[in-house]
Amino acid sequence: GKSSGKGGRNAGGVEHNWNEDIPVLARSMVLAKDTIFLAGPPDNTDEEDTFQRIIDRDKTVDAELAEQDAALQGKHGGILLAVDKNTGKQLSSITLQELPTWDGMAAANGKIFITTEKGKVICLE
């Protein structure tokens, strides 16, 4: 069946507390108390709209796809996003100079540690 909204069921029969689009393609994620931290390249593309434009042979979509590819390659750095675990609302975000590695984030003692594709470790407080 269709999702019945907040707290509804999706086709898999799983209860959802919330469902939010976020402006990052999460490569790393960690929960610290009531905050979910996600890090990755920016997500500049609305996939459903883009797919329809490709079907419609809209040539203007090529530039957007090239921009998203550049983001995936790390040309725009990354984003660290903080999200409330209870509501899904974005709390804050910062720009990272480099892309995080896959699953390369940890939280401990009030700090976030992120490893980057260029071999650095970043500590944020």
What is each of the regions a protein language model found here?
Residues 1-125:
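Extracytoplasmic/lumenal domain signature
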